[in-house]
């Protein structure tokens, strides 16, 4: 039976069960506007029903949003636009990469030495979005085929509510030219910008072997993090992804066996993996439940986890190429350039939890960096969350894959491994 009924407000009001689920309090960085999110930015954990961690409320809200049709209105507006640039409140956007690239070249938009001017893809939909993950039981329920069809269409439609905008990437290795005295290989760079660069000669020989990655690469990265952040007391690498469009082997993901699979696609959309809520929720569920933890088992009580999280902690993603990157580089945006910009929440609905990632609209002032021809020993680091909220340090960065217009047509696509971690102080 379809759930196209009611309103988001009523869905939320129906949730009366008092839950023992960890519920993060509302949190904002000093000077940061409220997010564009459901429930005024409160986590769906606040709407737990009999231990479901808010998953039913989030799924119902997804159907309400589809029925209200605002997302479809954005698609209709974009698809009815004439070819060429589309005037938006953020600037000129383009439906096609090639159109945006032609505009960049025609207007002589140039980057400094080592940099690159190119199209980057942003959302233009200023509403929260919902993604029902592939492991959710809804997809396998024969009684909910109509619901699954509607959700599948909505998921595809996320990409139809995006445009390409012109941006400039600067060479992150030359960071000191843009920020005198700030080395890209320093914790100070992470504190200020939310991005940095590290060196790693890994002894892992096969990054397609999940067990070897966990056994060899995870400890290497934990050691790297503790050396990079001298004030840190603990580092936990908890999962990883492998990206290789040209991989010919088995790509199958199996979370129960700690196998992430091999991604054929690259996330070509400006986003961040966490936010104010999920940065804390993800940490606590790792410490107390080992939920989707591919790394070292954790055995914290709730009280011990609360004590650990009462001190500073960060979520850091680290991306290491398997070979020199020729195409589909991984690019990073530095914190100060969007510190006063509201993020847009994307809810990822599992059977047992509601994750939150974030998307951003375009600004020409966004401060983008890349590592041209990034080598296999160069590890790009980006902050996904920082528990310090007083504005003294970066809270996060955001990132995307992109297409390098200067690469040869036969350049191989990026092959890399991305690990996710928490660092505690």
Residue ranges and their predicted role:
Residues 14-27, 31-39, 43, 50-53, ...:
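Non-heme Fe(II) oxygenase catalytic core, chiefly the N-lobe of the double-stranded beta-helix
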Residues 1-21:
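PEST-like, low-complexity acidic/proline-rich intrinsically disordered segments
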Residues 356-425:
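Catalytic core of Fe(II)/2-oxoglutarate
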Residues 6, 44, 65, 77, ...:
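Aromatic-enriched hydrophobic runs in primary sequence
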């Amino acid at each position: 039976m379809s759930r196209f009924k009611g309103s988001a407000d009523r869905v939320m009001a129906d949730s009366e069960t008092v839950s023992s689920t960890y519920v993060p309090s509302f949190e904002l960085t000093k000077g940061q506007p409220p997010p564009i999110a459901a429930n005024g930015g409160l986590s769906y954990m606040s709407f737990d029903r009999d231990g479901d961690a808010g998953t039913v409320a989030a799924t119902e809200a997804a159907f309400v949003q589809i029925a209200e049709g605002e997302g479809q209105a954005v698609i209709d507006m974009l698809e009815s636009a004439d070819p060429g640039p589309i005037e938006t409140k953020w600037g000129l956007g383009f439906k096609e990469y090639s159109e945006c690239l032609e505009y960049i070249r025609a207007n002589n938009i140039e980057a400094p030495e080592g940099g690159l001017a190119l199209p980057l893809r942003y959302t233009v939909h200023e509403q929260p979005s919902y993604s029902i993950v592939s492991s959710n039981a809804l997809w396998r329920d024969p009684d909910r085929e109509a619901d699954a069809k509607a959700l599948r269409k909505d998921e595809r439609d996320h990409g139809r509510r995006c445009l390409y905008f012109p941006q400039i990437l600067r060479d992150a290795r030359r960071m000191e030219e843009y920020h005198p005295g700030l080395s890209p290989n320093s914790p100070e760079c992470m504190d200020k910008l939310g991005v940095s660069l590290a060196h790693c000669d890994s002894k892992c020989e096969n990054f397609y072997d999940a067990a070897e990655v966990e056994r060899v690469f995870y400890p290497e990265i934990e050691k790297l993090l503790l050396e990079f952040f001298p004030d840190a007391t603990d580092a936990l690498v908890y999962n990883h992804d492998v990206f290789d469009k040209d991989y010919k082997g088995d790509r199958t993901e199996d979370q129960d066996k700690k196998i992430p699979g091999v991604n054929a696609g690259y996330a070509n959309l400006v986003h961040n993996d966490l936010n104010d809520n999920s940065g804390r929720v993800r940490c606590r569920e790792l410490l107390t439940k080992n939920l989707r933890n591919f790394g070292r088992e954790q055995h914290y009580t709730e009280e011990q986890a609360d004590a650990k999280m009462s001190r500073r902690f960060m979520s850091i993603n680290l991306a290491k190429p398997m070979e020199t990157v020729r195409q589909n580089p991984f690019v990073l945006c530095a914190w100060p350039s969007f510190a006063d910009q509201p993020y847009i929440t994307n809810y990822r609905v599992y059977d047992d939890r509601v994750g939150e990632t974030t998307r951003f609209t375009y600004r020409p002032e966004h401060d983008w960096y890349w590592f041209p021809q990034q080598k296999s020993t160069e590890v790009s680091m980006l902050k996904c969350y920082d528990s310090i909220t007083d504005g003294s340090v970066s809270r996060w960065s955001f990132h995307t894959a992109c297409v390098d217009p200067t690469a040869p047509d036969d350049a191989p696509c990026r092959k890399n491994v991305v690990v996710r971690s928490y660092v505690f102080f």
